[in-house]
């Protein structure tokens, strides 16, 4: 699909699947690069970033780029610390693209986007979707031999959907076996045997991979294939068949990819040492009926928990949902980033869809550079620290206002419904903005007013960067 003709889909799955449904064999390439045949990626084993380049300084920035027709220029993606792209891209573009990306930003982490939950009924050509053809067992763009036994359905044969009209797979640990495998075993084999060997990835983003599903269109279904429906309350949630199935898949992936970053949806239960962290779509966004207080508390708690693999990787995703360049656009961006800074997550702002990476003053300090705030003074702060009343340092300086301190500045976020005045006890200064000069005006302050559902990043004393 041409970018101008692509429907505006703010859900990452909806955007990605709109591209996956394209049947045309269109040429894939990198914006700004000559298009030619993809190179063999078998020599790319040294591409992932080294541990030495991954010192955690803040803010941590990300993009979740799911367009299927082209990748942005290297310089665009290299602005971010973490990049998510579809798992098929190593088959479509030259290996040089990824080598240049690493060279441009050595601390960048590259994750493959994978969805094992929503089965596909249509794809593009096998040349452009080879891994998806293998996973879903396609013979032609519209003909698949994927086993019905691995699809979720009721005892009466009614197919189960969790997202739009896409039939959900059966990832439980009691799914019927086909060829001696349950679907979760087959899926883990595919991730470790087809996606990971491309050699360019730092990790995998398992989208829709959660044991608590809120949008399934059936209240019960036949998880065992024996003709007996099981109520949802006995399928989903910690300790139930879906959780156990996902956990077995995570164990397989972790054992075969011990150093890989593995992240899953915010609805996933963390089990010790398996996942690195969670992904929060539409994080703290009241425009899509997310409760900012609930989201922030869950995000901070999950990041501080011992269950995820250390040091942990979490991701919050925000869609613009406001006129570009408007005061509301900038307020929403400040709010989402400041909330993300209350823990160690990467923040991914997206535009009208998941093919529009966004960038705001606060992400690099309006030109100060990556990680301009430096290290956090309280690593992995628990919720009890973030919410503790305080008039200085990390904590809560006013009702529903939270603060976190860094080497070179502070972040404050107001998740409440009323403006709050916050005394700072020392002088800080606003960023000297490029895009938003109204708030980021470079002025020195020792008292700030933070409007409802807004945030601010302030720099430390003038001697700091």
Region spans (language model):
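N-terminal cationic amphipathic segment used for targeting or macromolecule association
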Residues: 2, 20-23, 42, 47, ...
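C-terminal segment of N-terminal export signals and the immediately downstream linker at the start
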Residues: 29-52
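N-terminal export signals
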Residues: 14-34
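N-terminal leader/targeting segments
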Residues: 3-4, 11, 360, 365
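Glycan-processing catalytic domains of CAZymes
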Residues: 47-463
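N-terminal secretory signal peptides
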Residues: 1-10, 21-27
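Twin-arginine (Tat) signal peptide motif
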Residues: 7-14, 36, 44
């Amino acid at each position: 699909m041409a970018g101008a003709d692509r429907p505006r889909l703010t859900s990452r799955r909806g955007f990605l699947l709109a591209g996956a449904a394209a049947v045309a064999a269109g040429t894939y390439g990198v914006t700004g690069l000559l298009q030619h045949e993809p190179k063999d990626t078998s020599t790319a084993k040294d591409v992932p970033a080294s541990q030495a380049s991954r010192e955690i300084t803040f803010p941590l920035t990300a993009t979740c780029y799911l367009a299927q027709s082209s990748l942005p220029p290297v310089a665009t993606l290299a602005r971010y610390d973490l990049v998510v792209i579809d798992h098929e891209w190593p088959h479509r573009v030259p290996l040089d693209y990824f080598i240049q990306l690493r060279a441009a930003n050595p601390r960048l982490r590259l994750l493959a986007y994978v969805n094992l939950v929503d089965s596909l009924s249509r794809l593009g050509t096998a040349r452009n979707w080879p891994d998806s053809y293998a996973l879903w067992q396609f013979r032609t763009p519209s003909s698949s031999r994927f086993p019905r036994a691995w699809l979720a359905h009721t005892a009466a044969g009614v197919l189960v959907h969790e997202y739009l009209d896409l039939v959900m797979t059966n990832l439980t640990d009691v799914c019927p076996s086909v060829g001696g495998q349950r679907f979760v075993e087959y899926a883990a084999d595919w991730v470790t045997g087809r996606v990971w060997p491309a050699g360019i990835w730092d990790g995998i983003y398992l989208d829709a991979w959660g044991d608590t599903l809120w949008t399934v269109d059936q209240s019960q279904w036949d998880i065992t294939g024996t003709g007996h429906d099981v109520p949802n309350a006995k399928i989903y949630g910690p300790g139930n068949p879906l959780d156990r199935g996902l956990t077995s898949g995570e164990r397989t992936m972790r054992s075969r990819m011990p150093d890989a970053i593995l992240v899953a949806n915010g609805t996933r239960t963390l089990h010790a040492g398996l996942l690195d962290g969670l992904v929060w779509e539409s994080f703290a966004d009241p425009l899509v009926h997310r409760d900012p207080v609930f989201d922030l508390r869950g995000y901070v708690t999950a990041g501080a928990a011992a269950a995820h693999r250390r040091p942990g990787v979490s991701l919050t995703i925000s869609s613009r949902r406001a006129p570009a360049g408007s005061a509301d656009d900038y307020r929403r961006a400040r709010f989402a980033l400041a909330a993300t800074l209350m823990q160690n997550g990467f923040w991914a702002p997206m535009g009208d869809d998941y093919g529009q990476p966004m960038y705001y003053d606060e992400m690099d300090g309006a030109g100060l550079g990556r990680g301009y705030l430096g290290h956090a003074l309280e690593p992995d702060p628990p919720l009890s620290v973030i919410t503790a009343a305080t008039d200085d340092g990390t904590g809560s300086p006013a009702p529903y206002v939270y603060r976190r301190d860094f080497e070179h500045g502070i972040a404050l976020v107001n998740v409440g419904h009323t403006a709050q005045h916050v005394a700072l006890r020392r002088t800080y200064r606003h960023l000297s903005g490029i895009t938003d000069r109204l708030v980021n005006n470079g002025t020195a302050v020792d008292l700030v007013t933070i409007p409802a559902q807004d945030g601010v990043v302030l720099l430390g004393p003038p001697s700091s960067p």
